[in-house]
């Protein structure tokens, strides 16, 4: 228990929260914010807005932060869904005690922003010119319906990279479907090589599909940043978690 307490304390200490959206904007666009301490990582100086709600998007942002990017996690006023995911410190299901949430958001700053309000959307548009990357995991078309989709945000910052990580990608017949972990495994064919021959297939332990989506998202974003630094151009990265799983399944055949 002492080790668990120490770990939770360290994780919490690495997260800085701003709850007032106007304060968020002031801090991100101020000269002081632009001159954040150097992390001496390969992505030092890169600024990222993480709008994701799931494991894959959060893990993508976590990896970018680990490599030195300045990542700000923007959550709805009710908090990101990962806050309600255990295990919890002391077995207390409190939104500030989800060890999973803290682990996925290590090395990030945090703020609340309500994208369902005009004020929140306007603040997001004013923040975008000051960042290099936006990560999101909403249903395809959700942000566009509110006027803050890729086409809307790239109008504010022509070199913006948006990384969208969803169960089935931005296009295609399944794009609007929800996809839980076991669905990603089954449709990505990885369950065809799990379990014992002649018996029912088994789901792998943990959230490997989500981690694969986040890992591919971070790798693709890093490549896009290389292009951005050379050409000044941004792009919209479309990551399908199921396709990431399928790629892994192909590699094991």
Question: What kind of feature is each model-predicted range?
Answer:
Residues 17-233:
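N-terminal helix-loop segment corresponding to the beta1-alpha1 unit
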